[in-house]
């Protein structure tokens, strides 16, 4: 079974995207999928009608100086090689084509470089959701999920178009991947050393892909028994959601654990 061994971003409240890609943005509506979450393919305003306030404006391409040295995710050999191949292809850098044998790798680290954040104001998001009415008649599929607190909305994403990679064998010794990577990436990709044992890959024309996110659980506040004589529906509020993985149904099956110091299965 493939595992995430360590996620440095968890300490900053970020959850992982199983398969980093474009198209993941603040205000995207997610739904519970076993122990993790999946994309509904729609933004939050498709489910909630405008009421007291409009949906918050997305602030894009914000600098993340405190995360530049802390955007590292450590995988076991199989997961690491799979993710490395995925990133190379999504960023149009190249393809492994079996040139790296996962059996020879005990752990592999991906450190995202040139990281930027897109986000929305939590206060504005809370005001929008708490003052809106859901269009449950148009979304029967999500009606019960909304009542059961199984819907989420993204409030922040991290994105990058370059990364570095390092790997170790079963004895804990570093594996030199530079020659192998130089032999498989496209000519336009710059390959160098970010640190002694890390191979850095940069392709300036690559569109950034999202690799981590923050999400808010939408909490349904049921009416109390003494409120049933009042008009109006129950209201909604939001709460930070941690320890989930954003799944792509066409990709790796994932299973997250609540404790950040435990393994996450991918």
From Swiss-Prot:
Signal peptide: none
Stated family: Belongs to the bacterial gasdermin family.
Name used for this protein in its record: Gasdermin bGSDM
Segments crossing the lipid bilayer: 67-83, 95-113, 162-179, 187-203
Listed GO biological process terms: defense response to virus
Organism: Gillisia limnaea (strain DSM 15749 / LMG 21470 / R-8282)
The entry's keywords: Antiviral defense, Cell inner membrane, Cell membrane, Cytoplasm, Membrane, Transmembrane, Transmembrane beta strand
Keyword RNA-binding annotated: no
Comment field on protein domains: The N-terminus has marked structural similarity to the mammalian gasdermin N-terminal domain. The C-terminal region wraps around the twisted beta sheet core, probably stabilizing the inactive state.
A GO CC term attached to the entry: cytoplasm
